[in-house]
Curated annotation (Swiss-Prot):
Its EC number is 1.2.1.71. It catalyses: N-succinyl-L-glutamate 5-semialdehyde + NAD(+) + H2O = N-succinyl-L-glutamate + NADH + 2 H(+). One of its GO terms (molecular function) is succinylglutamate-semialdehyde dehydrogenase activity. The gene is astD. Keywords: Arginine metabolism, NAD, Oxidoreductase. This is N-succinylglutamate 5-semialdehyde dehydrogenase. It comes from Pseudomonas aeruginosa (strain ATCC 15692 / DSM 22644 / CIP 104116 / JCM 14847 / LMG 12228 / 1C / PRS 101 / PAO1). Pathway: Amino-acid degradation; L-arginine degradation via AST pathway; L-glutamate and succinate from L-arginine: step 4/5. One of its GO terms (biological process) is arginine catabolic process to succinate. It comes from the Bacteria. Belongs to the aldehyde dehydrogenase family. AstD subfamily. The active site is at E244, C278.
Length: 487
């Protein structure tokens, strides 16, 4: 089966056998063989060969091609949404919004490139000072499984726009989405070698990340893998490394007038996408006392009624499956471990169908747990921590190596301004779901959550480097020579 796209040709893999499975029914969605080191090398070489012509292509022509890609995505939106749902387990309504985000990424990237890069000039003494931006060359893009279309797209589109050529390695759990996305690029007329696809797991990823022909690597995924890449790229300052990783995100709740609005916002923050967004709330900080008790009682009651089901079920579920049976098992074991350390299950996470990666929402009160693990449990498992006062809430919110997202539900603007200053996160929301983000704003965090701001408006910053020039049409003597020189 031809599963890799290298130098404008579809090729069969020569590496390990791969399958992607429907997370609910466990049927085979895609099968093939991964790319081995030789094929990875061929992909990097193809990108290097294509780079000079692509980088010299006028910006407006590159934009035209990207706009044709967006139009192709629109024309194939239903097909792509279904494949995303089938392979990830997320409901069709959510898959459709992902495709829309992929389409919109083109216009956002063009706007960002024009505003944040491009060319600027001005007079400086007897010369002209010019600022330009140039592409790095050949970059690798590693994609995650939770948004297998949108998140890699957030690297690939700005990278190509800036004039780079790309070798794309998607998650081994979502190869079919990647294959269909590549076909949309091909339909849009992308030249051979400009974007190459190598499918595979660890073997393929290690070969690509270690390739000496790369000028950079853009990654969205787990902190564990991101840390490995960071170590691997250590001592290579000549290469650009952009990492967007996870978070142990806190959502602090104060007593608010509209309790149901707070409950809805918490659910959207913690359980959207079955908890498989890097900005999902992992820790819910609730005040001690009667109001906090009432909030949790209502949260548990509503969460217990959330519809969970297959991606194409009707009526549509709120939550689909997590990505795989192994992911579901890991989450259930994490819940068991926390309960064993003293956590109180307010709503136990369950697996309603044996052999399916469907999970119901889980809510644990971990206030009494000593040495709580600072870990991102990537699924519908929410930890509740009761706090005594706002200062204690902020201390608890910041008690993490991560720094991706933090949120506050409060009727007090003064409280939010304090939270904004004292919290440690790249995204800080007030009375909005933690998973909400503006495409015109930077997306990313600090600490173990990564560097740079991939997948959003600021992606232009790491896809091209600035070049400063002093220019004059001819060589001429200055009006006054430097002391000690005579001509």
């Amino acid at each position: 089966m031809s599963t890799h796209y290298i130098a404008g040709q579809w090729l069969a893999g020569q590496g390990e056998t791969l399958e992607s499975l429907d997370p609910v029914g466990q049927g085979v969605v895609w099968s093939g063989r991964g790319a081995d080191a030789t094929q990875v090398d061929a992909a990097v070489c193809a990108a290097r060969e294509a780079f000079p012509a692509w980088a010299r292509r006028p910006l407006e022509q590159r934009i035209e091609l990207l706009e044709r890609f967006a139009a192709t995505l629109k024309s194939r939106a239903d097909e792509l949404a279904r494949v995303i749902g089938e392979e990830t387990g997320k409901p069709l309504w959510e898959s459709a919004t992902e495709v829309t985000s992929m389409v919109n990424k083109v216009a956002i990237s063009v706007q960002a490139f024009r505003e944040r890069t491009g060319e600027k000039s001005g007079p400086l003494a007897d010369a002209t000072a010019v600022l330009r931006h140039k592409p790095h060359g050949v970059v690798a893009v590693f994609g995650p499984y939770n948004f297998p279309g949108h998140l890699p797209n957030g690297h690939i589109v700005p990278a190509l726009l800036a004039g780079n050529c790309v070798v794309f390695k998607p998650s081994e759990l979502t190869p079919k989405v990647a294959e269909l996305t590549l076909k949309a690029w091909i339909q849009a007329g992308l030249p051979a070698g400009v974007l190459n696809l190598v499918q595979g797991g660890r073997e393929t990823g290690v070969a690509l990340a270690a390739h000496r022909g790369l000028d950079g690597l853009f990654f969205t995924g787990s902190s564990r893998t991101g840390n490995l890449l960071h170590s691997q790229f250590g001592g290579q300052p000549q290469k650009i490394l952009a990492l967007e990783m996870g978070g142990n995100n806190p959502l602090v709740v104060e007593e608010v007038a509209d309790l149901d609005a707070a409950v809805y916002t918490i659910i959207q923050s913690a359980f959207i996408s079955a908890g498989q967004r890097c900005t999902c709330a992992r820790r819910l900080l609730v005040p001690q006392g009667a109001w906090g008790d009432a909030l949790l009682a209502r949260l548990v009651a509503v969460s217990a009624t959330l519809r969970v089901g297959r991606f194409d079920e009707q009526p549509a579920p709120f939550m689909g499956a997590v990505i795989s049976l192994s992911a579901a098992e890991h989450l259930l074991k994490a819940q068991e471990h926390l309960i064993g350390k003293g956590a109180q299950p307010l709503l136990a996470m369950t697996q309603p169908i044996d052999g399916a990666a469907l999970l119901t929402p889980g809510i644990l009160d971990v206030s009494a747990v000593a040495e709580r693990p600072d870990e991102e449990f990537f699924g519908p498992l929410l930890q509740v921590i009761r706090y005594s006062d706002f200062a204690a809430a902020i201390r608890e919110a910041n008690a993490t190596q991560y720094g991706l997202a933090a949120g506050l539900l409060s009727d007090s603007r003064e409280r939010f301004e304090q939270f904004l200053v004292e919290s440690r996160a790249g995204i800080v929301n007030w009375n909005k779901q933690l998973t909400g983000a503006a495409s015109s704003a930077p997306f990313g965090g600090i600490g173990a959550s990564g560097n740079h701001r991939p997948s959003a408006y600021y992606a232009a910053d790491y896809c091209a480097y600035p070049v400063a020039s002093l220019e004059s049409p001819s060589v001429s003597l200055p009006a006054t020579l430097t002391p000690g020189i005579s001509l």
